[in-house]
């Protein structure tokens, strides 16, 4: 888990490939409200977050209830991500209804065994976002990334119910540096 552009997908794919385990990636590109949200956040926050909630539930539920899939999986997101983003993006009233629906759905899912929380400087997040080149993300405000960062920290400190480990990627470019990747794996294994 972690902020937008921190490297969740890249790390999950690398670990999945190296350890021959399935990788469950977030279906963000299927959300019909995502691009609209960045243009008009007040108008599209609610449909965006409810779509993500239902899509994440379906994705995790389908995976874990399929008898033909391994129960070991690496994912670039968790179900609780929905709460973190909804708390930032929704009004207090909308969030209350959202949280009730989240709670009804979450009891139907298995909890992850471990969560790895990736951290990165806000400036580097912005660079990573620019490099990956999704047009709708290019004008993302650093204040929004800061809110997400604070939202994750608040959730981890006050609501997290499974073991988690925080890894600061500021000096660990695991994409370009194998030694950095091995250090990350050591942290994960030791956890």
Give, region by region, the residue ranges found by the protein language model.
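Conserved substrate/cofactor phosphate-moiety recognition/catalytic segment
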Residues: 17-55
């Amino acid at each position: 888990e972690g902020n937008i552009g921190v490297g969740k997908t890249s790390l999950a794919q690398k670990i999945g490939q190296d350890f021959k385990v399935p990788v469950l990636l977030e279906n963000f590109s299927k959300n019909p409200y995502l691009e609209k949200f960045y243009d008009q956040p007040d108008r599209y926050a609610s449909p965006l977050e409810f779509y993500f909630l239902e899509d994440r539930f379906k994705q995790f539920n389908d995976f874990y209830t399929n008898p033909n899939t391994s129960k070991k999986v690496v994912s670039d997101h968790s179900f609780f991500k929905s709460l973190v983003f909804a708390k930032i993006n929704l009004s207090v009233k909308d969030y209350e209804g959202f949280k009730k629906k989240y709670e009804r759905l979450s009891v139907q899912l298995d909890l992850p065994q471990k969560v790895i929380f990736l951290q990165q400087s806000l400036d580097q997040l912005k660079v990573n976002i620019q490099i990956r080149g999704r047009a709708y993300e290019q004008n993302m405000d650093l204040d929004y990334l800061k809110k997400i960062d604070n939202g994750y920290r608040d959730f981890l400190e006050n609501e997290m119910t499974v073991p988690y480990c925080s890894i600061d990627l500021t000096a660990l470019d695991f994409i370009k540096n194998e030694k950095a990747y091995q250090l990350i794996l050591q942290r994960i294994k030791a956890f």
